[in-house]
Amino acid sequence: MKVDLPESRLPSLYRDFRPLKDLNPDGYEANISTWRDFFLQQYISNSNRIIFTIGTRTLQELTHEVYGVPKSIDIAIDVLVNEGNLIPMELFNLGGMYTDNSRKGFWKWVRSWKESTNMYKSRKDETNFYLREDKFIIKANLEKEYQRFHELLKRSVFMEASSITDLVFTRNEFVTTESLQSFFSTYDEETKNVFLHFIENYKHIIVSKDNVIKVIAAEVEDITSRFSKGITENDLRIASVKVGIININKQITRLRKEINESNIKLRGPEFNELPKRIRIEYKQARLLSEKHLSRLLKFQNNLAQVRTQIDTSATNAVLIQTLSESNEVIKSINGYIGSTEKVEDLLDEIKEGHDRTEEVNDLLAHYNKGQDEEAEEEIERELEQLELDEKNNNKEENKNQDLHEPKESSSEDLLKRLNNLKINTNEGPVQDNENHDNEIRKIMMEEQPR
C-alpha cells in the first residue's frame, strides 16, 4: 500500500529507532509522533471501523520497496493503547474499556491477562514480523457509532413498543429488523458481536441469553418495570413465536412470487403450444402452491392470534398489578383516615367550631357597628360646623363687597352728570356761566370722600 509519510524522514522511520531514545530523544519522540499520527489518520479516525487488527499483515502492508518492513512501529501502537485510543480486545471483553489508565490498579489488572511487567507491549520478539496478532477496539469510533445506533433505536423500538413482545427478539431478528438493518448491514459478524457486547455490558441497553435479546433501556422502563430484567422462559417462548411468524412470512412471500410467475406463464401464448400433459402438470403445481399458501396463511393467523393473546395477557398482568397497587394505596389512605365514627366526630367538631366562629363574628360586627355610628355622628357635627363657617364667610364677603359698590356707583353717577353738562359755545350772560361753574363745584364737592 502507499504510505503517506514524509519522504525525507523515511530512512529514520523505517529503521529500528529504539536506540534513539538515549542517543537522540527528540528524534525518537518525533518518529513515534509521526507513526502515531499516521495510524490515527490512516486506520482510526478516517473510517467508521470499530476493530483495528495488527500483526504480520500490518507489517506487510507497510513494507516499503526500498526500506523494507518498518522496524519499530510497535512503539507507536503501544502509545495509542496507553493513551486509550485503542482498547485491547481482551480488556474490552473483561469490562475494562472505561478503566482509568492512570490508576495503579489498571495495569495490575492488565497483567492478569497479559504477561506484561509494565504496560501493554505489541512486540512479541525481534524477528522481521515482530508484532503480536492482536485486535483492538477503536474507542472513539465505537462511541460515535453508538450515538447513531441509539438514535435509530429511539425512533423505532423506543417509540413504537407497547408490550413486552415488542422488546424481545432473536439475535438475527434484532440485527435485521427494518429500523436497524441499515446500521448492522455494514458490519461483519465479529463487529456485530463487539457492538452487541458493548450495548449490553457497557450501555445496558439490552440483555441476552441463548440467542435471545431483550431491550431493557431506561426509555422503555414503563414496560420492563413489570417484568424481570433478565431473559426468562417466557421471553424465550415469545422469541420462538416471533421466529415462527417471521419464517411463515418468508414462505408466504416466496409462494406468492411463485404463484404470480406461474400465472404469467399459464396466460402466455407459448403455454398453449405445450403438450397437454405438461400443461396439466403446470396447473397442478399452481394449485398445490395455492393450497400450501392457504395453509400458511392459516398458520400465520394462528401465530398472530397467539402473539395477540400474549400481549393481552401481559397487559392483563400489568393491569392486575396496577389494580393491586392501587388497592393498597386506597387501603393505606383509608387506614390513615380512620373509622367512619372518627370522621363523623371530626365533622361535628368542625361544625361546632364554625358555629362558634359565626357567634364571634356577630359580636364583633355589633361592636364595630356602635363604633361606626359614633364616628358618623362626629363627622356630621364637623360637617355642620364647616357649613356654618362657610355661611359666615360668605356674609362677610358680601358686606365688604357692599362697601365698595357705592363708591363705584357714585363714580358712575359723576360721569353721567358730567356728560349731561353742556358747554355753551355761544356768548351768553355771565350769570349763566357762573351758575354752570357753581354746579360743577357742587358735583365735585359731593364726590369728596366723607
UniProtKB/Swiss-Prot annotation:
It comes from the Eukaryota. One of its GO terms (biological process) is late endosome to vacuole transport via multivesicular body sorting pathway. One of its GO terms (molecular function) is phosphatidic acid binding. InterPro entries: Snf7_fam. Pfam families: Snf7 (PF03357). One of its GO terms (cellular component) is cytoplasmic side of plasma membrane. Residues 387-439 are annotated as: Disordered. Residues 387-416 have a biased composition (Basic and acidic residues). Present with 2530 molecules/cell in log phase SD medium. This is Uncharacterized protein YJL049W. It comes from Saccharomyces cerevisiae (strain ATCC 204508 / S288c) (Baker's yeast).
